[in-house]
Every structure is written in C-alpha cells, then in structure tokens.
Amino acid sequence: MQEPKHTDPAAMRGAHHRRARSEVAFRLPDDLDLGGGGAGAFDEIGSEDDLFSTFMDIEKISSGPAAAGGSDRDRAAETSSPPRPKHRHSSSVDGSGFFAAARKDAAASLAEVMEAKKAMTPEQLSELAAIDPKRAKRILANRQSAARSKERKARYITELERKVQTLQTEATTLSAQLTLFQRDTTGLSAENAELKIRLQAMEQQAQLRDALNDALKQELERLKLATGEMTNSNETYSMGLQHVPYNTPFFPLAQHNAARQNGGTQLPPQFQPPRPNVPNHMLSHPNGLQDIMQQDPLGRLQGLDISKGPLVVKSESSSISASESSSTF
C-alpha cells in the first residue's frame, strides 16, 4: 500500500478537504503481514459480541483523530481569516460526506482487521505483541472467548442430547402406560355395557313383577267381591229360612185324631211312626191344620207333598189294626 503524499496544511485548510486526514488516520503499519489465512481462520473470528466490540473500538479510534484534526482546522481557519457568512447547504453536504467517508473507512478497517485475525499465526501474534501489545491481547481474548463459546456450545449440545434421550425414555414409558390405560378403558367400557344390559333386564323384570302384582290384586279384589256376594246370598237365604215356620205333616195329625177316636189307645214305640220336631201346642190342638190353612192357604203349604196319601192311609190302617187287636185282647 502506497503512502499518500503530504500536502501543505495551509492549502488543506483553504480547500477544507477532510478526507485526506481521515485516510491518514487509518493507515496501517508497513510491517504488518496481511497474507492469506491458514487453517483455523474461523477459530480466530470469535463470537458476534466480540466482533461488535471490535467494530466499536475501531470506530472510536477512527473518529478520534478525525474529530481532533477537524477541530484544529476550524480553529486555524477562524483565526487566520475574518468571519464570513456560511452557506448552510454546503456545510450540510460536507458533513454528510464526512460521515459517509467515516463509515466506509470503518468498514474497510473492520474487514482488514478480520483478515488480519484470520491470517494471524502464533509467530505473527508474538511479533504483533511486541509491536502492539493491546491488539495482541485483544486477539488472544477473542480467541479465548471463542474457545469458551465453543465449549459452552458443546456442553449445551451434550445437555440437549441428554434431555432428548431422557424425553425419549419418558415417551416410551408413557406410551406403554397409555397402552395399558387404553386396554383398561376398553375393559371398563365393556363391563359398563354389560352392567347397563343387566340393569335394563332388571328394570324389565321389575315392570313385569309390578304388572303381575297388579293383576293379582285385581283378581283378589274380584274374588273378594264374589265371596262377599255369596256370603250375602247365604245370609239372606238363612234369614229367610228362619222366618218361614215348619209345616207339620198331615199324617201325625191324622194319627193323633185316630188315637183320640180309638179311646186313647197308644201303640208300642216300635210301631209308632217317626215324628219330626213338631211343637207340642200344635199336637195338642186337633184343629191346628185347619188353622194353618186358614192363616196361609197358599204360601206355606205349597211345600207340602199331598201325594203321600198311601202313607197316611197306611198309618190309619195300622192304627185301626192296632185298635182291633187291642180290643180282641
């Protein structure tokens, strides 16, 4: 790289050209070797934070001499020439050009520094430490920071791999548990369905039992009603029989009349016809049958069987024969 020619400071102050000083400020030493990089260039770059800090340092270094030179030139111009009105547009243009040039120079210097860091070997670094110790220390610090960042990245990757393995193991265990839970859920659902079916069957049985109980109750009520009607009919029939008087047959009255006509002759007990339960007051009155006929000529004598005439005749003949035999004796 060729050195720029030194010009007269008075001419530079008259032209107000500031870029010449800025270029001189970024001049690198001649003994610095900027050859091609060797192996491990990426190891010397460092992290993004290191690069940013390096860029800020270079920008401060580049802006310091330029600002100092600019202020000296302004002071010299103010003292040498009388004050004159300034054109604002021209000054703004000059300022914008200065900042643009400063940014370009800073970018170029950063690129040169990166190339220098890539190309640095231990021998060159030792030579640089002898020439510029601060820069060598900064390069060493960047290398150490890069090594630490690599170590952190390696530890982080190892930790991530360990976590991935742990998560895979947990996922396998959880999948097995999920399979068991699904199997249990299937069994429980089948058992639940069976219990529902049994519950429906029990409900149907309960409904049938209720219907059967209702039918039995209805049948019982019907039987009670039927039994009550029969009991009422029997009671009415028995009460009717109690009110109906017993009709004395005709043949005991005839026999009694015959006995009175024969003078009170009595037959032995074996020849006497059987007598029903006849009241004594009816037997004592010979005209009882006629009184009964007069009291109820139709109703109560309808049950008498008048066709039993031979029995009456037989009893009379037996009584007559008995009276004849008694008279013969």
Swiss-Prot record:
Boundaries of each bZIP domain copy?
132-195
Segments of this protein annotated with the region Basic motif: 134-155
Compartment list: Nucleus
GO CC aspect terms = nucleus
Keyword Transport among UniProt keywords:
no
- Could you say which protein family the record assigns here? Belongs to the bZIP family.
Q: Which UniProt keywords apply?
A: Activator, DNA-binding, Nucleus, Transcription, Transcription regulation
The record's account of tissue expression is: Expressed at high levels in roots, low level in leaf sheath, but not in leaf blade. Predominantly expressed in vascular tissues.
Q: Which gene encodes it?
A: RF2b
Q: What is this protein called?
A: Transcription factor RF2b
Subunit composition and interactions: Binds DNA as a homodimer or as a heterodimer with RF2a. The heterodimer binds stronger to DNA than the homodimer.
- Protein's UniProt keywords contain Transcription regulation: yes
List the InterPro entries hit by this protein, alphabetically.
Answer: bZIP, bZIP_RF2, bZIP_sf
What are the transmembrane regions?
none
Q: Which SUPFAM superfamilies match?
A: Leucine zipper domain
Q: Where is it predominantly found? A: nucleus
Q: Residues annotated as region Disordered?
A: 1-24, 62-97, 260-303
State the function annotated in the UniProt record.
Answer: Transcription factor probably involved in vascular development and shoot tissue organization. Binds to the DNA sequence 5'-CCGAGTGTGCCCCTGG-3' present in the promoter region Box II of the phloem-specific rice tungro bacilliform virus (RTBV) promoter. May regulate tissue-specific expression of the RTBV promoter and virus replication.
Region named Leucine-zipper: 160-174
Domain of life, per lineage: Eukaryota
Q: Which GO terms describe its molecular function?
A: DNA binding; DNA-binding transcription factor activity
